[in-house]
Amino acid sequence: MKKCVVGIFFALVLCLAMLPMAAFAEDTVGAAQSSRTVITTVDELMQFAADVNAGAYDGKTDAVVSLESDLDLSGKTWTSIGCADNDANVPHFFSGKFYGNGHTISNLDFSENYGKTAYPSFGFFSEVYGAEISGLTIQGKLDVSNSGYVYFGTVAGVAADSKISGCVSDVSFTDTDKYINGTVALCGYAIDSTIEYCQNKGNFSITKDVSSLQMGGIVGLAQNSTVQYCANTGDMTSWTPCTGGIVGQLYQASKIINCYSTGKMVPLGIGNTDFGGIAGTVGAGTKISHCYFAGEVDLSQYTATTPYKRLGGIAGGVSGVSGVSSDTPAFENNYFIETENVPACFKYQDAGTEKTLEYMKTEAFFNEITTAGGKYRFNSNGTPLLPEHKYPTVEETPRYYYNSTTTVKDEGKTGSPKTIDAGVGMYAVSAVLSLTGMVYVNKKKS
C-alpha cells in the first residue's frame, strides 16, 4: 500500500511538471503578454503606426513592441508613428519600448510626406516621449519634395526623456535645391535623452544656404542630452548653420562621449556657417570627450578666408557662451585629422589634438586615446572601433516550466547546448534573440 501511495504521489508530481505554465501562473503570463505587440509583416507595422496615431497607445508606458522580422517597404508611402493635428501639435505618440531585435526596415522612402503641414516632426517615429527604442536599422532615402520646417530624424524626429540604443541609420538625404529648415539626423531633436551605440551610414547633402537647420550624423539638435558610443561613417555636404559628424548643435549641458566620425566633410559657402568633425556648434556647459574625427575634409567648394573661424576638426563654432568659467564648453582627450588651416575649434584651440590619418590607424594611437580614458577596440585595418554592445532585446517567457535536466544554450555562449546546473526546484526559462539571430537563454530558479 505504501508503495502504491508513493507511486501515485510521483505520478502527480510528474503530471504537474508537464502542465502548461498557465496552471501555475496564468495571470502573470496574461499580464505580460497583454501589452506586447509583435510585428512580423508590413501590414502589422502599418497597423501599429495607425493605432498609435489613433490614440490606442496613449499613456501606455508599459507597452512592448517587438519587431521580429526584416521588412521591405518598397512602394509604401510612410506615415510617421505619431502624427500632428491641424494645429501642428502631436496629440498621440509612443511612450513604451520598441525592440528592433537587430532587424532592418528597408526601402523606406520619406520623400512624399516630408515638409507637409501634418508632419512638423518626421521620421520612422515622429515624436517619442519616455520611450526606449533599440536594435533597429532603418534603410532608405529622402529626396526633399516640399519646402518646410521639419524636425527630421530617420529613427525619431523628436525624442524627449527617451533612450535610443543600438540603432543604425542608412538613409540618404538630399535637399534637391529646396529651401528647408529644422533638423536632419538619426534623431532630429533630442531633449533630456540618451542616444548610445548608434551609427549613421547615410550621406547627407544640403547645397542651398538655409537660415535655421541643424544636421548631424546622430543628433541634429541636442538639448540637455547625452550622445555616447556612437559613430558616423556617412559623408556630409553642407551649407547649413550647424553641421557636425555626430551632433549638429550641442547645447544646454549636453555631452558627446566616446564617439567618432570618419565620413567626409564637404563645407560649402563663404564661411558663415558652423561645421565640425564632431559637433557643428557647441554651447554653454557642454562637453566633448574621448572622441575623434578621422574623415577627409574637402575644401574645394569652401570660399571662406583663412584662418577658418567656423570650421573645426572637433567643433565648428561656439554659441551662447558668456565668458563665465561655468559656461565654457569642456573638451577632453579628443583628436582630429590633420588638415591645413583647420583647427580643432577656432575659439578653443585645445579642443583636440591634430594627428595624421596614418598615425590614427596605429596601435600607438589606440593606446593613446584609451590610456586617457577612451573606450575603443583596436582595429588592425583602420582607426579604433567602438566597444561591443549588446542592445536590449525583448524577452520571451515560455508557457512551460522545465525541470533541472532541460537542455538549453547558456546566455552569452554560442557553443553546444548544455544542461542547466542541477538544483532543487523548477526553472523558468526565457529566450533572448541576439544580433546574429542566435537565441540566448536566461535561466531563473523559481
Tell me the role of every PLM-derived stretch:
Residues M1-L12, N442-S446:
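Positively charged n-region of N-terminal signal peptides that target proteins for export
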Residues V5-V13, M426, S430-L433:
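Sec-dependent signal peptide hydrophobic core
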Residues F9, Q223, L435-G437:
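Generic short amphipathic/hydrophobic targeting helices enriched at N-termini
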Residues C15-F24:
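C-terminal segment of classical bacterial N-terminal signal peptides
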Residues A23, I420-G423, S446:
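Intrinsically disordered, compositionally biased charged tails
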Residues F24-T414:
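Surface-exposed repetitive/solenoidal architectures
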Residues E411-M426:
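Extracellular Ser/Thr-rich, low-complexity/disordered mucin-like segments
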Residues G423-K443:
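A cross-kingdom C-terminal cell-surface attachment/processing module
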